């Protein structure tokens, strides 16, 4: 497995250290709908007009269903398993949110490029789709407290391992996913690198496998997982740019829901919920060595 070519120190530099807390039990499924089919329709009057585009906390509780945007093709964070059920790190968290809200979770499949749109149009109440916090995004949506650390990384075939973005060959294409921090970062910091853009994680992975680009830039957690799960690939750049955090997002101005999520994240930190989430959904991919570097408990990143 080519993941072994990445030093632990290099990986940690891209992810940083986070504070840890205490313990937790797994979330129950009785208060959430895990079927992929359940995400095909949006529950409640989410898409209202004007400033009422979002549903408040009380409106969500009254409806009995919370619409949560998650990935359906990004294993191990959000994906649909062989039984048609949503699984992954973000989904595990989403089910707990729904349970503690006392409502059912209606999962709505999202792509990276439409996460903001789905909030702005009221298609979802919450985005839990590996959403990296950036100043630009914070102008359009409201982010809750973080629950994970992340940086960017670059994966490429063993036959031509990319270890630097300097002196780039103008004929070589870099694969990115539209709407991701990788696209934004490369466009700004490396404008001379041609970008081959795709709408989903599945199509980006297929593009790399088919040789449509020399490398794929994305969250380092994602490219490391890809290299571990697919022989013949190496993460030659495990840390690119600065360390960032991943957090839930709600529609701009939805303070009642935002405040509730922040309080929930703090409360879950007292139970070490996200360590439990990691051990249930991510440990097979990243192992136990990186748990404390990836997990953010109680919203206290870099504490």
Model segments located where?
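Extended ligand-binding regions for polar small-molecule ligands
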Residues: 28, 41, 51, 91-100, ...
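Periplasmic-binding protein-like
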Residues: 149-156, 224-265, 284-303
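A ligand-binding cleft/hinge motif common to bilobed small-molecule-binding domains
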Residues: 117, 131-139, 209-243
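N-terminal secretory signal peptides
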Residues: 1-6, 10-26
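Flexible hinge/capping segments at coil-to-helix
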Residues: 156-173
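Extracytoplasmic small-molecule ligand-binding "clamshell" domains
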Residues: 49-130
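Bacterial lipoprotein signal-peptidase II cleavage site
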Residues: 27-38
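Ligand-binding clefts/hinges and TM-proximal coupling segments of bilobed small-molecule sensing domains
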Residues: 29, 181-198, 235-237, 265-303
């Amino acid at each position: 497995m080519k993941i072994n070519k990445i030093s632990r120190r290099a990986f940690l530099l891209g992810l940083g250290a986070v504070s840890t807390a205490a313990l937790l039990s797994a979330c129950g499924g009785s208060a959430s709908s895990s079927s992929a089919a359940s995400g095909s329709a949006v529950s409640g009057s989410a898409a209202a007009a004007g400033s009422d585009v979002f549903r408040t906390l009380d409106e969500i509780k009254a409806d009995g269903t919370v619409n949560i945007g998650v990935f359906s093709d990004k294993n191990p964070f959000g994906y649909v398993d062989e039984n048609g059920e949503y699984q992954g790190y973000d989904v595990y968290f989403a089910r707990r949110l729904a349970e503690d809200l006392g409502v059912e979770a209606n999962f709505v499949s999202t792509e990276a490029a439409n996460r903001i749109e789905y909030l702005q149009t009221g298609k979802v109440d919450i985005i839990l789709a590996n959403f990296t916090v950036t100043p630009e995004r914070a102008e359009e949506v409201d982010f809750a407290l973080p629950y994970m650390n992340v940086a960017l990384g670059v994966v490429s075939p063993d036959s031509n391992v990319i270890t630097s973005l300097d002196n780039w060959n103008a004929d070589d294409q870099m694969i990115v996913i539209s709407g991701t921090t990788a696209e934004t970062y490369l466009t700004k910091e490396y404008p001379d690198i041609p970008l081959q853009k795709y709408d989903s994680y599945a199509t980006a992975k297929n593009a790399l496998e088919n040789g449509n680009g020399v490398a794929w830039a994305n969250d380092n957690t994602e490219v490391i997982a890809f290299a571990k799960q697919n022989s013949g690939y190496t993460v030659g750049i495990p840390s690119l740019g600065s360390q960032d955090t991943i957090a839930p997002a709600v529609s701009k101005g939805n303070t009642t829901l935002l405040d509730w999520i922040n309080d929930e994240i703090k409360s879950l930190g007292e139970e070490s919920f996200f360590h439990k989430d990691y051990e249930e959904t991510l440990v097979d991919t990243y192992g136990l060595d990186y748990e404390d570097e990836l997990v953010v408990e109680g919203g206290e990143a870099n504490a």
